[in-house]
From Swiss-Prot:
Catalyzes the folate-dependent formation of 5-methyl-uridine at position 54 (M-5-U54) in all tRNAs. One of its GO terms (molecular function) is tRNA (uracil(54)-C5)-methyltransferase activity, 5,10-methylenetetrahydrofolate-dependent. This is Methylenetetrahydrofolate--tRNA-(uracil-5-)-methyltransferase TrmFO. It comes from Rhodopseudomonas palustris (strain HaA2). The lineage of its organism: Bacteria, Pseudomonadati, Pseudomonadota, Alphaproteobacteria, Hyphomicrobiales. Pfam families: GIDA. The keyword Transferase applies. It comes from the Bacteria. Belongs to the MnmG family. TrmFO subfamily.
Amino acid sequence: MIIAAPPPQPASNQPVHVIGGGLAGSEATWQLARAGVRVVLHEMRPHRSTEAHKTDGLAELVCSNSFRSDDAANNAVGLLHAEMRRLGSLVMRAADANQVPAGGALAVDRDGFSAAVTKALAEHPLIEIRREEIAGLPPEDWGNVIVATGPLTSAALAEAVRALTDESALAFFDAIAPIVHRDSIDMSIAWFQSRYDKAGPGGSGADYLNCPMNREQYDAFVDALIAGDKVDFKDWEKDTPYFDGCLPIEVMAERGRETLRHGPMKPVGLTNPHNPTVKAYAIVQLRQDNKLGTLFNMVGFQTKLNYAAQQRVFRTIPGLENAEFARLGGLHRNTFLNSPKLLDAGLRLRAAPRLRFAGQMTGCEGYVESAGIGLVAGLSAAADALGRSMTTPPPTTALGALLGHITGGHIETIDAGPRSFQPMNINFGLFPPLAQAPTHGPDGKKLRGPEKSVAKKQALSARALADLDAWIAASLKLPAAA
C-alpha cells in the first residue's frame, strides 16, 4: 500500500520552521508540506559551508552514494526503504529516480539525487527556502521548530542546545563499539556475570557477558590489533582530538602491552563457571545494548580498524568465533544528543517541547535512517500543526524500532561508566522478537542454520509491513493509492 498525498487542506497560518537542509530536514519539510502545512526551511549553505560539504544543494550526500540494500524481505535497511516509500518519502522517490547500478544495493547519482530533492522542495507552493545560518536557538515567536542540523552542526547552535540541556547532552566524537547478535555468542565459553557480582540500577549482578583469554591468546590479540589495517580520519576530522574515554582500542594497545588488561579487558572480580579453578589473563566484556536483550556491545572496543580487520581480529576472541555483528565499530567526529534522556517519544526536547530534533543528531546512523527519522518528525509536527493526534509507528516496524532506540531503547550504564547511548543503524536486533519464529519451510521441512535465519528475517519484515499498513490506516487516516 503506497500512501497518496492527503486531500488539500487549508495551510496552517503559523509555519513550521525546519533548520537544516540535509536528508532529515528535507524529508521533514516534504512531509509537512504534503500534509498542507506551510514550512520555512533554513539552510546555511552557501553562505556558510562545512568541512565536508562541496555544494549548496539540499540533501547533499557527503560520503558514500549508497543507501545500502534494497531487499525489503531480508534486510532491515531494505525494509526501511519500503516503509518510507509507503509513506510518500521524497528522499526515496529521488533515490529511485536517480538510481545507478549497484547489485542488490540502492546507489544513486549523488548530484542528480540532490538536484531532484532541491527542485521538489523549491517548487512546492507551501515551502519557503531561506539561505541563512541560525546561529543559536530559534526565536520563541517561530513556534514549532524541527532542528535537523546533522553531525556537523555549527558550534553556535550546538552550544545553545548544550546550555538549554546539560553538559553531557552532546558528544563531539562518535565512540562506536561493535555490537554483536546475542544468539551468535558461544555460551559454552562465555558467561553472564557483573564484576564482583555488583547489581547496579536495574541490574541483576549478572549483566555482562564475559569472554576469557589466556596469556597466549591475549598476546596474539594485542599483536593483531596493532597490526590491523586502520581507516584514516577524513581531512575535516583530523583536528578533533581524542577524548580519554573514547580512545580507539588499538591506540590503547599501542601504549603498552598490558594497557588493555588494566583497562577494558581487566580480569578482576570475575570467575569463569566453565573452568572455575583457572583465572583468565584478560576478559572481554559485552553489555546488553537494547531492552530486548538481542544485542550486546563490546565494552570499550571503539576502533578505527577497517571492517575486514575488525571481523577477523574480534572473531579470535574466545566465544566470538562465530559472532554476527549488527554493527561494526568506529570513531569519527559527530554531534548527537543523549536522546533517550532529552527527547520524548515525539522527538520533542523535554526542556523546550516546541523544538523537535531529527536526523543524525538524534542518534541514528546512516543516510536512510536520518531521512526516516526526519519523516517521522515531519509527520508528528504536521499532526501538531493541524490539531490532530498521531501515535508513533509500531515498534515492530523499522521506523518504530529505530525511533524506539533513539527515544528509549538503550540501556543505562550499570556502573559509574559513561552513558551507553550511541548512534545506531537499523538492524533486526532492534525489533521485538516474533511471537512464533518460523520452524518449518513451505515444503514442511524443518529449518536449520542459514535457512532458519532467512525465514526469521522474512517473517519480521512481513510483520513490519502489515503493522505499518494498519498504523497508516488507523493513525494517519490517509487514502491509499491504487
